Amino acid sequence: SSAASDVYKRQAMSSVKGLCPNFQEVKSLNDLKEAVANIGMPGILKPVGASGSKGIFKIESKTHLEDTFNLLLDSTSPNKDKVYSYYPNLYIYEEYIEGEEFSVEGVVQNKEVFIAGITDKRVTPKFSLEYIAFFPSDKPEKVKDEIKKKTKLAIQSLKIDHCAFHLEGRLTESGFKVIEIAARPAGGFITSHLIRLSSGHSFIEKIIDVAIGNNVKDSWPDYENGNKKLCFYSIRAHQSGLFKKIAGLDFIMEIPGVIAVIPLKEEGDEVIMPPQHFSSCFIANIILEGESTEDIENTIDEIESFIKVEIQ
């Protein structure tokens, strides 16, 4: 459903008080100046039609608004990434909300929302690039209950039905705020690996059931109480250039808890850093399991201690 991926549908969610940050539509530099005046700073300027946290700019001062807007136009050109071709030159400016980031995975069938679980995420301070995700969430039940309650309100306000959804939001001092919803399953190995390997139940199977009209209400598994914590972690480059290799990559698979290593670059591939490109800096993805988030973080620290991304 394009209804949910179109960020303007937040207007529907805005009818539920406190559910999402204030925002304004931006099509020109003047629109941006007006939005900054109305909403204030800091704020987030981003394209309407994108995925994977692409094209996100944090606005903290009025001094470089024109430069930032021109950079946004250039870096979100459909020539750079076809994801921008669906809603070309359509942007929103929204209030920046401080807090930890989460996503919620589930399906909606016959207007009833079924939640598979909550994913704890981390993003880079600049450009909000997602580089790590843990499933299921470590948060206390009270927090998870609030996130789920607001997720259901958001989904129902959009009136989407008979599809999977992937909702993103942040936990602020004044509660959970919804940032965006896509009427599709999550990427980043969440749907394909993390949920299944953590819980022992296939989430994809239920997504297919919804798509073909099989009722999921009586057979909805418990995805959140498996005996393992799962994680995907992205190794990133920190400079532009030509990719040479990841020194130490061969040893990663020998570490207990590492399930898979997926290289994303071959020798000689160009690496372009944000904001010129938002996904080129990702060099490899690692899927890990452990007894806890802390357990997996220790494994990641071990990996980071001996690998080196070599860029020429």
PLM regions: where:
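Active-site "cap" helix and flanking loop/linker of ATP-utilizing ligase/carboxylase catalytic domains
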Residues: 146-167, 182-244
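Short, small-residue-biased leader/transition segments that mark boundaries at the very start
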Residues: 1-8
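ATP-grasp fold ATP-binding core
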Residues: 13, 39-59, 78-99, 104, ...
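Conserved ATP-binding module of the ATP-grasp superfamily
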Residues: 20, 62-98, 127-133, 152-157
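Short beta-strand-to-turn element immediately C-terminal to the catalytic PLP-Schiff-base lysine
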Residues: 26, 56-61, 107-109, 172
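Peripheral (often C-terminal) accessory segments that flank ATP-dependent C-N-forming ligase machineries
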Residues: 208-312
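Beta-strand scaffold of nucleotide-dependent catalytic cores
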Residues: 57, 67-70, 92-95, 101-122, ...
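Short, well-ordered beta-strand elements within core beta-sheets of diverse protein domains
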Residues: 57, 95, 196, 282-290
